[in-house]
Structure formats: structure tokens, C-alpha cells
Amino acid sequence: MSETADDLFTREDPIFATKELLEISHLPGEGRIVGRDDEISQLATAVNPAIFGQSPSNVLIYGKTGTGKSLCAKYVSRRLVETAGDEGVTATFAYVDCAQDTTETQAVQTIADSVNAVDDTEINIPDKGLSTSTYYKRLWRILDQRFDVVVVILDEIDKLSDDDILMQLSRAGEAGKITDCKLGVLGISNKIQYKDRMDERVKSSLCEREFVFPPYDANQLRNIMEARSDAFRDGVLEPSTIPRAAALAAREHGDARKAIDILRYAGEIAQSNGSTTVKEQFVTQARQRAETDRFRELIRGSTPHSRYVLQALAVLSLSNGQQEGFRTSRVYEIYENICRQEGSDSLSLRRVRDLLKEHAFLDIIEQSKHSGGSAEGSYTNHQLLEDPEVVKDVLTEDS
């Protein structure tokens, strides 16, 4: 190997100054949160009683992906903890990604582990190995021992396998599970219709307040990216780069998460090309990469047959154009072909219909019902909302 150590590594990043400002997990300060003053104020009002040691309202937050729901919930919760401390109230918040912790046991374990300090409580919260009821009992003990108020953020709440944890958390005080701690829940969902699936008892206790976060417009997206532009070194961004990224993201339902991803990927593409500037032309390439990563994350954990159904729709879309979608029978025919190619037994038509409904719920596809008259009867068309090339590429690389 001919490279010296000095040749092998770059000691100074020529593009990024503070790259973490462009990471989705980064929680920015108030000055970097753009276009959500009203939503932050509404959330703060809902949980305001907590700073005095009283029960915060339970809140359900709706909005499309990338509209700032998680960001604002975390920001308000962090500020609540700080302000409550100034008032002599011991508070904290726990965050659960329900797309990862989909079961009741996983979610309650994450909450208990997040709020625990074993040196103080002498309560152990193992990753696994306890019953759900034991995790709950330990959680209630921790809350009463350590805190006056706790807020639990359940992100992507619609990914939970059932409503049981919502019932337990929203009624913990009423049921006498905790006596010295007040507990509030902030549920976050991309699906406005999610509430329709809830148990009526959960709905009555969890949905005390409801807020809808609208999509960002192009100007707001531009401001969001400009507020994080110091992630880059001075002078590396071409003047047209941020406006172009904002325009592309605005076209995709005002998704700020995607806008930030596009900007970060454009910088990485500049790095890999050896460019000293982040050019507008890199933004288009970055959008494709962001779209691919977003879809990959969307189908993470899905079953092989769930993927075969999507693959069938991608095949139809690429062969025939999107049209107005494709009938269930046609999708099923291509799905069966894919199953044969994969050496897998196909599921029943009824089960494939269920999988298509699940994809529609996740906004991966759109379903529309049609009447074919007395000769054909009614039928359902299914249309991909994702780029079929992206769907094909992601499903092919994972097969």
C-alpha cells in the first residue's frame, strides 16, 4: 500500500463545518425551528400545567411526514423539563419510536429504561426477559420514586400493534398505578384517520387535545435550510442550491425532513466528486438518494410477501405507466409470477387485498373504487404513490 497516513485521511472537511445540524436526530435550538411558532405555542399550552407539578393534557398530533411533529414535541418537552426545574418540579420526558418498538412490551421497556437511574432506584430494566406486567410495575415504581411529572412521546403511534400501552399510560393515575407522579402522553401519527382505529376508551382519555401540523411551503422549506446553512463551510453553497432543494421538497408534500436530507446528500455528493462547492446539479442526484432512503425506511421490517405485492405494482407501473392504477386481479396475477420466481408459495387473494390495504394506510399506494356497471360490478384500482424505479431498485437490492 503506497499511501502514507497523511494521504489516506482528510484532516479537514472541505464541505461541512458542523454536519450534525443536518442530521434528522439533531434537535435544534428555538432559533432554528422555522414556521412552527403557533404549533409550539399550542403544545406548550397543553402541557403547561406540568411545570407546576400538575397533570399535562394528553395530546394527539397529526401531520404528514416531515412537518415538524417530532421536532416540536421534543423541543417543547425539553423546555418543559427546564422550566419545571426552575419551579422546583422534577420532570423528564421519554421518547419512543413506535416504528421500532412496535409491541407493548418493547415500548414500555424503552420508557422504563429511559427514565430509570439504577443507582438511585436500584431497579433493573433488562432489554428482555421480563413479562409485560413486570415492566409496567417497575416503570410505575421508577416514576413515583424519581419524578413529579413525566411526558411520554409516542412517535409513529400508528405503528403500535395494539392500543394496550395507550390505555395503560393514559389511565395510570386514574387507575392508581402511580400516586406521586403525573403522566402525560404526546402521540404522533402521520395518519389523520388513525383515531378511527382506536378503542373508544383509549380515544376518550388520550385525545384530550388534537393538533394538525400542515405541510411546509417552499418559502418555509427554504428558511428551514437557510437556518441550518452554517452546517456548511463559508462559500461552499451555490446561491441556487437551497432554492432548488426547497422547490423539490415542496413538490413532495412540504417534507422538511426530505429537504434537509437532500441538502446533506448534495454536500456528500460534492465531497465524493472532489468539488469545492455544493452545486445545484448535485441537488437532483441528492433527491433521488433521499427518495430511495426514505422508501427503504418506510418498508423496513415488512414481510417478503408485502414486498412482492409492491414489486408487482412497480412492474405494472414501469410496463404500462401509472394510468389510474391497476385492478386487484391484475396485481395478484403479477404477484403470483413473482412468488414463482422467488420459489415461494403465494398467499390467497384475500390476504393480498389485506396487504394492499396496509400499503394504502402507509400512503405507499392509493386505492380507488370504481363501478364497472352491471356487467363487471365494482372493482378497486391500486396506484403506486412512490417512484416505481425507486421501488424496484430498493426491493431488488434487498431480495
Named regions from a protein language model:
Residues 60, 235, 244-305, 320-324, ...:
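C-terminal helical "lid" subdomain and adjoining coupling/linker elements of P-loop NTPases
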Residues 3-5, 14, 102-112, 117-168, ...:
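Mid-core helix/loop region of P-loop NTP-binding domains shared across ATPases and GTPases
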Residues 77, 166, 353-357:
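Short, hydrophobic-biased segments on the C-terminal half of alpha helices
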Residues 1-57:
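A short, basic N-terminal segment
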Residues 44, 306-314, 332:
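Hydrophobic residues on short alpha-helical segments
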Residues 82-113:
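AAA+/P-loop NTPase substrate/partner-engagement loops
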Residues 55-75:
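Walker A/P-loop nucleotide-binding motif
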Residues 323-399:
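Terminal-proximal interaction/regulatory segments of ATP-powered molecular machines
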